[in-house]
């Protein structure tokens, strides 16, 4: 089981997602629950998880929905996940 932490920017992203679509918010919550239970290892291939590079070096990303992304940092040793950003491709990149 991983501890989940949130950045201030993630909290802002979450408010925007909830305002745009309750269904997207629920889908994101489901992925966060999966991550909490087993980290990135517990996500199946349908989420297209992968490591990022550049300014998000060492971060993970997955596709909650085709245009809803989640970016996080994960520490295996500390069993900690920091949720960094969430949103559409246009919002994040």
PLM region spans:
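Residues forming the ATP-binding cleft of Hanks-type serine/threonine protein kinase domains
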Residues: 87
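Basic, Lys/Arg-enriched alpha-helical interface segments
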Residues: 1-66, 75-80, 90-93
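Acidic, metal-associated active-site segment
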Residues: 72
